[in-house]
Amino acid sequence: MAAKEVVFGNDARVKMLAGVNILANAVKVTLGPKGRNVVLDKSFGSPLITKDGVSVAKEIELEDKFENMGAQMVKEVASKANDAAGDGTTTATVLAQAIVTEGLKAVAAGMNPMDLKRGIDKAVIAAVAELKALSQPCADSKAIAQVATISANSDESIGEIIATAMEKVGKEGVITVEEGQALENELDVVEGMQFDRGYLSPYFINKPETGSVELDHPFVLLVDKKISNIRELLPILEGLAKTGKPLLIVAEDVEGEALATLVVNNMRGIVKVAAVKAPGFGDRRKAMLQDVAILTGGTVIAEEIGLELEKATLEDLGTAKRVVITKDNTTIIDGNGEQAQIEARVSQIKQQIEESTSDYDKEKLQERMAKLAGGVAVIKVGAATEVEMKEKKARVEDALHATRAAVEEGVVPGGGVALVRVASKIAELEVLNEDQKHGVVIALRAMEAPLRQIATNAGEEASVVANTVKNGSGNYGYNAGNDTYGDMLEMGILDPTKVTRCALQFAASIAGLMITTEAMVAEIPQNSAPDMGGMGGMGGMGGMM
């Protein structure tokens, strides 16, 4: 085992604070509408230009082991905020730096670190309760656009496109962000349920100009097995011929004689039919077939539940307003399933998402829920160069996370105002002793730090801006975008409550632990000078000083 170096007391805290400051100073220049960019060197490809706090934090590794420990702990703050709310990483870093700096000063002055931490924790619990009281629901499309715009660094086009996407696919819908081919951002919305399976034979195509199959008011047959014998399908096809309606078959596979007969009947116009493979594999396929059944009001024909294809009737089939099948995708639009059953299925999938521990499973469940609840929207980010594309895509993703957080827990006045108002309300918090009281004061001072940093990045005097905002009341705050004061809600400067809450909680949690540090242990760096080679006939000479 390698030898370790141990540093105690103030020496340890000074080194740790130096690491905290290096990381936080690199991150906090990005805060606010006039925040600057940070350029990150990549081992391959072009450098990455970003205004995303967590991206900057993740890149930082320091040479000094003790300084690096401080930096890594603050990096954890940014990562946690990003995982929980998807945004607010820079705010969390600024808060953590402010609490650690003030806290370590107090420890150096002889105060009890544990009491300081208790005071900070009490202040944060009270602040979170006040934040929730201050929060307002984010109901309309305009508020959603404003939240997205602020998070995307005041880019209104991103705010608009996210609001439109949410309006079209609903709050439970899936919105994904991709790199586009054009110069402008584009929104692609797939309404209804789409899955990635195309027609089994090109002879089903009835719209040659688009190379697709379109069925109006079709029946939908769902089968959880391979169909190779046409005899099994005859009762359904005979019943169908009398109605004159088209049929979509979704099965594990349709092959051989069965597929050939369907194609011939389709080409002769006896029955309008199209067949596609069921989406997914194994248990996921069974679940997705059940989703389609609930959406269309049909039944999955599966032998394991005692249903045979030969005995199926038209009552077992689902129906939809329209089905469009291309080479790669099948889209079922306006299934005729019962709304109550669809909602029950959505809440069941929601429960599975909460219980799942795998990110992959969560993503797939989220997609299934979206397809049942409304649809899927794809935002294609447009830019002139690859460097700009990556930077813009990161901003769109941040804005999307912020919007989701706003819909979940509501919004508070932005620009650091919410924390300042909350701090003024909990100034008289009751504590047990003077050291705890000072812990509360540290937390209250730290809550001003985001506002001060926004002002500094905008080229203003932080103290002047902070005092002006503190002298105001309610939603009154500083708009760094155009250097004016006024009602933040009216100016459309909103922050999601969840983002502000998570930033404060995670910053206080880790900063509180750092204040109570008394010793640090790290490996002693090895002197890796190579041994000297030996001269003729001699052995090596070992490392020389």
From Swiss-Prot:
GO cellular component assignments: cytoplasm
InterPro entries for the chain: Chaperonin_Cpn60_CS, Cpn60/GroEL, Cpn60/GroEL/TCP-1, GroEL-like_apical_dom_sf, GROEL-like_equatorial_sf, TCP-1-like_intermed_sf
EC class: isomerase
One of the protein's GO biological processes: protein refolding
Cell compartments where the protein resides: Cytoplasm
Similarity comment text for this entry: Belongs to the chaperonin (HSP60) family.
Function: Together with its co-chaperonin GroES, plays an essential role in assisting protein folding. The GroEL-GroES system forms a nano-cage that allows encapsulation of the non-native substrate proteins and provides a physical environment optimized to promote and accelerate protein folding.
Record organism: Shewanella sp. (strain W3-18-1)
Keyword line: ATP-binding, Chaperone, Cytoplasm, Isomerase, Nucleotide-binding
EC identifiers of the protein: 5.6.1.7
Highest classification ranks of the organism: Bacteria, Pseudomonadati, Pseudomonadota, Gammaproteobacteria, Alteromonadales
Binding site for ATP: 30-33, 51, 87-91, 415, 495
Molecular-function GO terms, alphabetical: ATP binding; ATP-dependent protein folding chaperone; isomerase activity; unfolded protein binding
Subunit comment: Forms a cylinder of 14 subunits composed of two heptameric rings stacked back-to-back. Interacts with the co-chaperonin GroES.
Reaction equations catalysed: ATP + H2O + a folded polypeptide = ADP + phosphate + an unfolded polypeptide
Official protein name in the record: Chaperonin GroEL
